[in-house]
Each structure stands twice: as structure tokens, then as C-alpha cells.
């Protein structure tokens, strides 16, 4: 039986790795997502039951569960040198002349490749298994990012040959993933990445591999650094790398001489804007590997290769108008409407103006002649005004005082750049608000994930959080992948959410600057949500840890007619809007706990809520003042910190005894054991 199980696990590993290669490397999937998911699920279940049969190249081993304290240093077996740059045809011909003089022969050719704008890494394989991956660093010493690199699905964990080899590649973020990531960061009010290269570097150097896995990075392998197998040309090496299972630099061209190489470079430049990934030039490499040894290297760069860098393409055009778009968090963003102009291979008719401060600093006006370029070759932006072409008929732009989508007030805090719509029912931001409303820390509607919300939203069945409570059986049962059982479960979850405490509802409303802690503070100082419609900024500033921004945000939010309408609908649906009289008990008052890892019976937010309802304080960090750390499965660095500080460690069974304690003496006894 055990041999049969082991054989089946091996079959699944090989099969899934094959389909990963077809999907992520060749972009030619042979099975549906559903079929793939079923294979993967079978493998996960078998590995759970038989962990002794987990193979190192199993696709389940790509994402580790532990957060690192830092990255170890790795000394590269072969230095990862940087390339010297040229910027013109003349400089390219000078490179060719120097190389011919150095080699004393014309009997060689070149390979021209894309210069991918990403992060350079070395991948090391022993007997065909991926054992180590490191960043370039200073060329001699890099950082060990093996676990993070395993999350990149186009990196094979096992090669077709059992060979020892070190290869070099460029990790990058595809353009569409970069745009998606920045949209998500904007919605979460996190700093945006300036370009795909920064996004790739920041993603690869995450201490938590799970974050890296979410970022959808990719890689092109472009060089054999060291290999047991004898290879004669770079062209042969690339073909061998592809055979082994690597995703190699695409569309490379073998050129007979430098003239052909320059022609290939110009073709690359013509299509750079149409590529799904970012490039900042082309690389010209000597093809014959033996001659590379003759040419040698300087301390920083090889003499046998050069990077031809492309300048950012800029064009003049007319700014016809400025439109205002409203994002999912309510931020108003000005967009330039342009006379169409071709830049980097595509026609541009709209460009970002970033924000109102940017418009003022650049003195951009409607009717101006402006210079447009593609930021990081992706997002068109207005970079400057051609003041010499001003006629006097240009118009100064002002941000609207009312939301162009829903008509609610637009506000701007003094120390912020952004202008925001305050409307709680604004269609432009309601999708994101609904996702927040149903989330675990808010109304905790189990089973109402992003796909369900998106489906309901696109069908027009929900437009505001209140619409959730109007959903009927017939609305849900016909949704994709929904049946009678899942429909009934979701309706039960929606019904259960009506009984959530008031602080959960306040947090669920998505009020700017009001997190869980502030929502709890508000709920503790009012009798019902109705009190917030008349509360003043002065009264709010008297509350613990309430600042001016928070106070202004609450008052502005609850003065909107849309808010009043939403609360009335929630009340009518039976959602609790009244504060609890008092905490269940103060038996844990004076104690501070930290949670780490996953408890089997309680979510993190549920455990926190229970502890706080008993008077305890729950902290995010461990210190000498921490009473105890409650540890679940797969704990993080907090456990290590607790052990270093000699802080009491409690497990799930201790937690359950603690919250069931009837007296302070019983609590002390548990903590002293």
C-alpha cells in the first residue's frame, strides 16, 4: 500500500510540474484550471496523510510558511558582473572595433537579446534539483532568496537532466501584474511602486515568501554561469537551458556582424512598447564562449558584451481636457485627455496627471501643449508644459467640490495630497467597500469571498452593503459554482452577521482613518450608532487616542445623507446598531497577550475579541510587559522573541482554560503552571 501511495504522489508531482511548465513557461496549457486544481488538491491531501513521501521538487514546496528574520549572504561561484552601456550606433561600432582588436580575429558572431528591466539572480542546481538562489548583490556576494524564488512558477524545481549547473536570470514583474499590484496598493492606501523593476525587487526581497507568491513574478534565464556540460556557443547554451526546462530570454537573434546586430536592436526598440514585460534596451553578446575567455572582463563588466540603452520616448501633443476619475477608495484622480499621439509603439490619448499638487507644480492647464512619455514604458504621463506655445486661451483646472459620480461632498485633509469622495453609496467605490464590509474583521460573513461579491456586483444584485441583507435564495442559487447547500450556508452567515457587536459595524462602514481600535473606542462611548449623527469634533477629540483627522473623518462621514440612508436600511434589515452594555467580564483585566500562529477552533480576530471581552489587552508585538504569548500552528518570529524574553508560552488548550476561568485565582494558576 505504501509503495502505491509513494508512486501516486510521484506521478502527481511529475504531472503537475509538467503542466506548470506548459502554462508558465510555454504559455500553452493542456488542461483546464479545474482539472489542474483537482490534481493539486489530491497531491496536497496525500502529502498531508503521508508527509514522509514529500519530494523536494513537489509543487507544494514552492511556498513556505515561515517569515524570515533576514537574508543570509551567499558568495557567488562565478561573479555576476554588470554590463557597460552604449547609447548610440557609433558607440556600438566602437565596442565591436575594440573587441576585434582584443581577439585578433573577425571570425565570430553576436547574439542580441532583450535587456529585461528586473532583478538579476543566480540559480544553483545539484543533480538537477534547485538548491539555492541568490540576488546579484555587489556581483560577488548576494542574498539567499531561495524560498522566495521557489514561488516563481517558471523556475523549475527539477531539471530534465540530473546535472550540476549555475544559471543567471532576470526576475521581473509583467506589465499587467504591475498595473494590478499598484491598483491594489492604491486601494489599500499603500505607497505605489515607481516601476515594474522596483516592484520585482521589493517583492523578491520580502521576508515572508507568501507575499512574494502573491506578486506573480516571472523570470527569463539568459546565461550559463557554470556547467559540467561543455557548451561552445551562447546560442547552444540558450537551447540547452530551454531543453532543461528554463524559460529563456525570448526572441533572441544570432547576428553575423555588428551591422546586423544594430538592425536587430532597432527592431527591438520599435516593439518595446508592445511587449508584455519591461525592457530598457538590448544586449549584444559575443556568441563564441571560448572567445569570451580570451576577451576577459574588467573588475565590473565583461569585455565581450554591452547593453544598448534606449532613451525614454517623449512626444508633444495638445491637452484637450482634464477628466476626474473616482477610484475604489474614493480618491479623485485627474486624467489628461490628449490629441492622440503614437509613443513606444502604441497610440496614447489619455495620460495620468497624478494629483492636484502635480498639476499646480507643473502649471498644467487645459489647452496647453504638453510633453508626454510612458512612465516605465507602461503608464503615459504628462511630464512638462511647452510654455513657449501658450496662447493665453488656456484654462486653469480646479478639482470639483462634489463627486462627479455620486454628488457627495469632496474633502481634502490639510496634510494629504488626495481629494476624496465622502459618499458611502458612491458606485465608484462601493465594490471595495462591500469587500471590506463582509471581511473577517468586519461583519465576518463566511463564504462571501471576492469572487462571490464580484459576481453579485456585476449582476447588479448588490450596490451597497445594505443590499446584502436583501439577497434571497433565488438570487444566489443560480450563481456559478453555487448550489442549494452553499446558498443556504451563505444566507445563514448573512443572518448571523446581523448580531455582530456595534464596533464591528462601525469598522465595516470603512470610515477613513477609523480602524478596529478606533471603532471599538467609539462603540464604548455611545449608546447606539445614532449618536454619531450628532457627535461633534470637540467631543470626539476627548476620546482616547482620537486625533483631529479621525474626528473630522467621523463627523464628515455621518453628516452625509447617503450615510443616513444606509444606516436606516441596515436597521430595517435587523442589523445590530446598539452598543453592548459592558464587557462580559473583567477577569483578564491588567493582562497583555500576544497571538501567533493559527488556532484550530478560532480565527485570529475571534480569539482577540474573546480576550478583549474579558478585559485583556491584545498586542501585536512581544515585550517584557507581555503576560503570555498564545501559540497556534506555524508560529512566526513572535514565539522566538517570547522565548528570548522568557515570556510565558500558552497553547490552544491553555487559551480555552483561560477564557473559561471563573476567578482571578484560576487565571493566575494557569499562568503560573
From Swiss-Prot:
Key word Nucleotide-binding present: no
Organism domain of life: Bacteria
Binding-site positions, NAD(+): 33-37, 82-83, 113, 136, 170, 285, 309
Swiss-Prot/TrEMBL keywords: DNA damage, DNA repair, DNA replication, Ligase, Magnesium, Manganese, Metal-binding, NAD, Zinc
GO biological process entries: DNA repair; DNA replication
Record has Coiled coil as a keyword: no
Enzyme class: ligase
Catalytic activity entry: NAD(+) + (deoxyribonucleotide)n-3'-hydroxyl + 5'-phospho-(deoxyribonucleotide)m = (deoxyribonucleotide)n+m + AMP + beta-nicotinamide D-nucleotide
A GO CC term assigned to this protein in UniProt: cytosol
EC number, as in UniProt: 6.5.1.2
InterPro entries (alphabetical): BRCT_dom, BRCT_dom_sf, DisA/LigA_HHH, DNA_ligase, DNA_ligase_AS, DNA_ligase_CS, DNAligase_adenylation, DNAligase_N
Matching PROSITE patterns: BRCT, DNA_LIGASE_N1, DNA_LIGASE_N2
Chain residues that bind Zn(2+): 403, 406, 421, 426
Names of required cofactors: Mg(2+); Mn(2+)
Occurrences of domain BRCT (ranges): 583-672
Pfam families: BRCT, DNA_ligase_aden, DNA_ligase_OB, DNA_ligase_ZBD, HHH_2, Nlig-Ia
Single GO MF annotation: DNA ligase (NAD+) activity
Active-site residue numbers: 115 (n6-amp-lysine intermediate)
Role played: DNA ligase that catalyzes the formation of phosphodiester linkages between 5'-phosphoryl and 3'-hydroxyl groups in double-stranded DNA using NAD as a coenzyme and as the energy source for the reaction. It is essential for DNA replication and repair of damaged DNA.
Record NCBIfam families: dnlj, PRK07956.1
The family this protein is said to belong to: Belongs to the NAD-dependent DNA ligase family. LigA subfamily.
Protein name: DNA ligase
Record organism: Caldicellulosiruptor saccharolyticus (strain ATCC 43494 / DSM 8903 / Tp8T 6331)
Name of the gene this protein is made from: ligA
